[in-house]
Swiss-Prot record:
GO biological process: lactate metabolic process; tricarboxylic acid cycle
Role description: Catalyzes the reversible oxidation of malate to oxaloacetate.
Ubl conjugation in keyword set: no
Residue positions binding NAD(+): 10-15, 34, 96, 119-121
Protein name: Malate dehydrogenase 1
Pfam family, one: Ldh_1_C
Active site: 176
Keywords: NAD, Oxidoreductase, Tricarboxylic acid cycle
EC number: 1.1.1.37
Length: 322
């Protein structure tokens, strides 16, 4: 049986980390694509040379032509300019929109059967544009946001309670940005919801609110600390978890930016919601009931994404023709 082929579009920090993780987890052969000559080839060779030490068998190829991604089962897209300090996600819009159009055309031509995971920011708008440009079925194109945001929330909670991260589940909905919605009542430690832990005296509501805020600003906190660049270890690990659920038909329930067509009262937009990922892609959208403040926060988040999508339509009206 031939190994699966995994294509990585963009060979920056996330791209390199993705390639390394694919090797370590033996998920398949890797093609790293980038417009910069030498970078994907150099990183591929470097990672390939670590394989005898770590004991994984995989072929790593660097390429500057989309032809190399032909037949990929999974395509993970990180191409685009990164966010710099002081730059809003929206500033990235027009630059990265053009990149998505080019990437989408490459996927359409060479990997039309792939499961596509977008990581490029501003995430919810970019995954929408990528689906339009590629013409792939909505269930086969998703955005990586919620897994990362939930991981940050889980890490902060585990740290606060001094318990294993494995015993903390957390739920983050909405757009990938300052308006994301970490749902406290659906987040648990060993199955005990956070509001109950407040009653048990494990923490206070005020402290939980601080952790929610820190989660919202998780990406910006790292950007400000690094000064040059943004997070790449946790985003890469998050995308790999999604890819693995697809490749192995694990049917994991994970929050991703998924296409909504009526669910949660949202139409023709990608928004972060819990879904089941199996070998058909997004196999089910989990529609939980939202009320009160949670519903308000979710609607606000959706409105922020809607604003970005409308801006995309103005910048690139040709996407609507796809």
């Amino acid at each position: 049986m031939a190994r699966d082929k995994i294509a990585l579009i963009g060979s920056g920090q996330i791209g390199g980390t993705l390639a390394h993780l694919v090797g370590l987890k033996e998920l398949g052969d890797v093609v790293m694509f980038d417009i910069a000559e030498g970078i994907p080839q150099g990183k591929s060779l470097d990672i390939a040379q670590s394989s005898p030490v770590d004991g994984f068998d995989a072929k790593f190829t660097g390429a500057n032509s989309y032809e190399a991604i032909e037949g990929a089962r999974v395509v993970i897209v990180t191409a685009g300019v990164p966010r710099k300090p002081g730059m809003s996600r929206d500033d990235l819009l027009s630059i990265n929109l053009k990149v998505m159009e080019q990437v989408g055309a490459g996927i359409k031509k060479y990997a039309p059967d792939a499961f596509v995971i977008c990581i490029t920011n501003p995430l919810d708008a970019m995954v929408w544009a990528l689906q339009k440009a590629s013409g792939l079925p909505h269930r086969k194109v998703v955005g990586m946001a919620g897994v990362l945001d939930s991981a940050r929330f889980r890490y902060f909670l585990a740290d606060e309670f001094n318990v294993s991260v494995e015993d903390v589940t957390a739920f983050v909905l909405g757009g990938h940005g300052d308006t994301m919605v970490p749902l406290v009542k659906y987040s648990t430690v060993a199955g005990i919801p956070l509001p109950d832990l407040v009653k048990m005296g494990w923490t206070s509501q005020a402290r939980l609110d601080e952790i929610v805020d820190r989660t919202r600003n998780g990406g910006a906190e790292i950007v400000n600390l690094l000064k040059t660049g943004s997070a790449f270890y946790a985003p890469a690990a998050s995308a790999i978890a999604m890819a693995e659920s697809y490749l192995k038909d694990k049917k994991r329930v994970v929050p991703v930016a998924a296409y909504l067509n009526g669910e949660y009262g949202v139409k023709d937009m990608y928004v972060g919601v819990p879904v089941v990922i199996g070998d058909k892609g997004v196999e089910r959208i989990v529609e939980i009931e939202l009320a009160g403040k949670d519903r308000e926060a979710f609607d606000k988040s959706v409105a922020a994404v809607q604003g970005l999508v409308e801006a995309c339509k103005k910048i690139a009206p040709e996407l609507l023709g796809h």
